[in-house]
Amino acid sequence: MNAYTLAKERYAALGVDTEGVLNTLKDVTVSVHCWQGDDVVGFDAKEALSGGIQTTGNYPGKAATPEQLMADFDEVLRLTPGKKKLNLHASYAIFEDGEFADRDAIRSKHFSRWVAYAKARGLGIDFNPTFFSHSMVKDGLTLSSPDETVRHFWVEHGKRCMAIAEYFAEETGKPCVINFWIPDGYKDYPADRLSPRRRYAQSMDEILSVPYDKTKVFPCIESKVFGIGLEAYTVGSAEFCTNYVNTRHITPLMDNGHYHPTELVSDKISSMLLFNDRLALHITRPMRWDSDHVVLFDDETREMMKEIVRADALGRVFLATDYFDASINRISAWVTGLHSVQKALLYALLEPKSLKKLQDENNFTELMVRQEELKIMPFGAVWEEYLRRENIPQDYFAEIKRYEADVLSKR
């Protein structure tokens, strides 16, 4: 009797059908961020990374061209199980030789190579307007700027991106989540907190006035508590973004690195699901701030996935990864983070439904005991069976070292 068969029997004794769990897991889509591969540089500008974002490290092998980034992404797809989408920033527009369009002039054709890439691999595409690392970010402001020239530039960028998002959805046949995050804020205490937020709301209203198919395109806005150089005030606070999405009937997006370190997104998920049809998540690992460390199979990642599964909301939550580490092999960073999300999903799906009954009966003594027992159940055997069925190498690191020797080390 192999390890999986034994694990299957152990979980069956708890009322958990591991076959059903594996069938569910393989159909859960995770949107994979492209920017781990090149440290959030993109292809449309040469400005340094800005907007309170920072990558650290200088590990060799960074992708420097669209071809290299696509090749690296292929390696990630090969080494990770489950369904995936490609998540792009607008800064990853691909221009032909001699061609360039600024961010207020980008068009669908500048992403046609990404569409061809995604369609050849059966991937959908999610999208993010890029409101950072650009000379038109004036005094740290974009959509909330009091300078109408600046604000109009970024409103036009947002409108162009909405059209591109619909192009992605139509071409791939899969919905496109388009996420708006702006770095706007102030380093020190402002004299006026209201006006920038009013301008941000006005700008978003203008962007969303562009007609779009609400069954294909899902706009989100993402909050943040602070960033480097934006310590005192962030225009897109959690309260602003929550109220905006609720009054405009769009999708909230929570990044678990964008809150105060004592706040847990896992505790927020159930509340958001009660009052929204959909919810989007950016899954990362904050280390005292929004450091975007590689996602691990840690407590909070597991708790977030458990909250989604317990709410029977896998069909309502858009899952996406968002981290970037330049200090280690970037393929390994990508793959390890994705494996961690998949492991957390599996761990959540293997939780017995009977735990809810214990809570409702105020049987907290047994609830504690059963929850602790689950931690040493043969979860690993089920995970290994999942990898086997998905034709993923058990020792993915050996494959990463081979790719580093054959490809990355020669860049």
Task: Identify what each model region corresponds to.
Residues 109-132, 136-247, 251-252:
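Active-site acidic/histidine proton-transfer and metal-coordination neighborhood
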Residues 1-146, 163-164, 170, 174, ...:
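Alpha/beta catalytic barrel-like cores
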Residues 235-275, 280-283, 288-290, 296:
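Long, well-ordered mid-to-C-terminal structural blocks that present hydrophobic/aromatic surfaces
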Residues 17, 154, 255:
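Conserved, mostly hydrophobic/aromatic
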